[in-house]
C-alpha cells in the first residue's frame, strides 16, 4: 500500500544507512564539530555558490524554525507569514512560545506576495499607535508551500526586494525544498536561494534522511553566536556527526541537485501538477 498522508512513511535512502553503518565506530568530536559536518557544510556552500555562508545542522524543522526566528528578531518583533504557514498552524505555537507573534497574511494557493508584505508593514508604520503593536521584523515562507505550490523566481525576487527595502529578514523554510528543486515547474536554484534570502534551509527529514535539516545563513548579521541559539533551543545534536554524514550521503548521490534526494515518484508528479 502506498501512503501519502505524510513524508515519514519510510526510513531513509539506502546511501544514508550505508554510510552510517560504515562509519559507526569512527570516533569524532561531538555537537557538529566533526569532519563529516565540516565536509557536508563545504558541499552545501559549493552547491549554493555561497563560500561565506554559515551552515548549521539541526535535528528537525521545528527546532530550525523557532531558533532562526528567535535569534533574528528583537523581543518586540514578529514574523509575517501565510495564514497556512507551518509556523502558524502546525508547530504547536513553537515560535510564539519564544515571544514572537506570527503575523499571518491571507494566502492564495499557499503563497503570499510582495504587495501584501509592503501593505502590512506600511499599515503598521502608519498607525499612530504602532509602538503598541508587534513590529514586523521578518518574512517567513515555505517552498514548496504547505499545499504543494511553488514560488517562482520572479515571485521570490519581488519578495526579497520588498524585504530589503523594508528592513525585514527573509527566511525560507526548505523542509521540502528537494521536491521543489526537482519539479519540472521549478525555475529556482540553490544559488538563487542563497542570493535572495537571508537564511534558508535544506530539508533532510522529509527528503531521504532519517532526520536533520541544514540551515544556511548568508546574512552576516545573523551569523554571530548562532550556535548559542541552537543549543538553547534544543536543536543541537550531541552526536552531531550523524547529521553531517546523512547530508554527505545525500549530496554524494549525484553530480547535480536533481539527484540529491530520493523521493516517491508519485509525489513528484503531484508537485509538478500543482503549481
What are these regions (language model features)?
Residues 2-275:
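Conserved PLP-enzyme active-site core in the AAT-like
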Amino acid at each position: 500500500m502506498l501512503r501519502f498522508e505524510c513524508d515519514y512513511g519510510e526510513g531513509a535512502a539506502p546511501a544514508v544507512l550505508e554510510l552510517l553503518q560504515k562509519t559507526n565506530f569512527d570516533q569524532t568530536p561531538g555537537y557538529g564539530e566533526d569532519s563529516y559536518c565540516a565536509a557536508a557544510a563545504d558541499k552545501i556552500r559549493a552547491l549554493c555558490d555561497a563560500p561565506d555562508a554559515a551552515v548549521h545542522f539541526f535535528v528537525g524543522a521545528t527546532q530550525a524554525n523557532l531558533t532562526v526566528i528567535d535569534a533574528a528578531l528583537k523581543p518586540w518583533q514578529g514574523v509575517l507569514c501565510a495564514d497556512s504557514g507551518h509556523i502558524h498552524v502546525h508547530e504547536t505555537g513553537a515560535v510564539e512560545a519564544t515571544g514572537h507573534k506570527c503575523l499571518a497574511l491571507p494566502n492564495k494557493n499557499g503563497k503570499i506576495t510582495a504587495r501584501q508584505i509592503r501593505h502590512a508593514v506600511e499599515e503598521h508604520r502608519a498607525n499612530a499607535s504602532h509602538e503598541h503593536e508587534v513590529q514586523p521584523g521578518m518574512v517567513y515562507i515555505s517552498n514548496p508551500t504547505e499545499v504543494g505550490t511553488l514560488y517562482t523566481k520572479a515571485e521570490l525576487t519581488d519578495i526579497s526586494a520588498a524585504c530589503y527595502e523594508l528592513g525585514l529578514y527573509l527566511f525560507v523554510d526548505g523542509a521540502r525544498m528537494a521536491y521543489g528543486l526537482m519539479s519540472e515547474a521549478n525555475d529556482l536554484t540553490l544559488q538563487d536561494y542563497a542570493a535572495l534570502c537571508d537564511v534558508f534551509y535544506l530539508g533532510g527529514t522529509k527528503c531521504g534522511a532519517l532526520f536533520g535539516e541544514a540551515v544556511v545563513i548568508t546574512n552576516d548579521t545573523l551569523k554571530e553566536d548562532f550556535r548559542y541559539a541552537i543549543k538553547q533551543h534544543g536543536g543541537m545534536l550531541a552526536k552531531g556527526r550523524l547529521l553531517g554524514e546523512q547530508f554527505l550521503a545525500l549530496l554524494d548521490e549525484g553530480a547535480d541537485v536533481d539527484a540529491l534526494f530520493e523521493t516517491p515518484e508519485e509525489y513528484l508528479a503531484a508537485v509538478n501538477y500543482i503549481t
